[in-house]
Amino acid sequence: MIAFLMGMFFSTQAADHVKGNGKLSTKKITIDDFNAIKFDGVIDFNYEQSESTPHIEITVDENLHPYVNIDIQDRVLTVGFKGAKVDHFTKFIFKTNSKWLKEVKASGNANFIANSPLKGDELKINARYSFFISSSKAIMEGTWLYGPK
């Protein structure tokens, strides 16, 4: 009986794991406006501050799109995987925009790429683990706050 229960436990756990198939695909959707971003894991997060309608462009292995979770609550955009444990993917790239940004919360081995100057009174960045910020432009007009989560 114990062996049967252990077998059921391990087979249930295995069913929750998924790996990318190596074939990248990109999907683009329109989203509600946000002013804060929260993400976790190995991700390249490209952000642009603009007046255009907010959208997200997601590039990931084609079989992983159903597990990508995008949620906006109280103007906080949360991005990650949901519904399965993703063990491996080829790339996980997000491109998005909003009118302004006041906070970034990142955890994991994340890259945050600012593709435009960020204008505002204050930008707060909370990061855990390995976090990299890059920009080819002047990144911030205003106050820049960086600290642990």
PLM segments and residue spans:
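Intrinsically disordered, low-complexity terminal regions
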Residues: M1-K149
